Amino acid sequence: MITSREELDAIKKSCRAMVMKSSGLSAGAAVIPVPGVDIGSDVTLLMRLIPKINEKFGLTPEQIEGLDTESKVMVLTAISNVGSKMAGKYITRKLVLSLLQKMGVKVATKGVSKFVPFVGSAVAGGISFTAMRYMGNSHIDDCYRIALETLENREAAMATSTSSSSQTANEGFVPKDAEPPIKDL
């Protein structure tokens, strides 16, 4: 479980580097003028990338299931608040394909542009790089917001429990130099 904002920022930076690498691989596959190679490689890349990002942020289904009840509720509430489609879920081919279909215009443009000699492959590679980077970074941003909300809620819960327990400990405490209470006659 992430314990500080510094740790969270380091995870985000590490995940951004993974996304850049995957985006480069996606662009490389898109340059190959064979229909379907780019989509197949994008699906494979995303099916590896998204679970790695989830794991780094502590948001795989197994990691969430291993949390205590209170922490699990905090994480699931944060996922719901952010509206993430991939955090805390098993990443399937069907899920990845549906996300790629939502980017359908970019994918279709990439497919058509491939068949324009020389320039078309470069355009397809650029579109593929941009689409992969967008999807990866969007997921990182979602995971970051989920983890940050969970961290802030956990800190607030700890502060509340600490202040209420110190209040309870101080009840009935009267300093030596305090004046005795005035009694009604």
Each language-model region and where it sits:
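Solvent-exposed beta-hairpin/edge-strand motifs
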Residues: 39
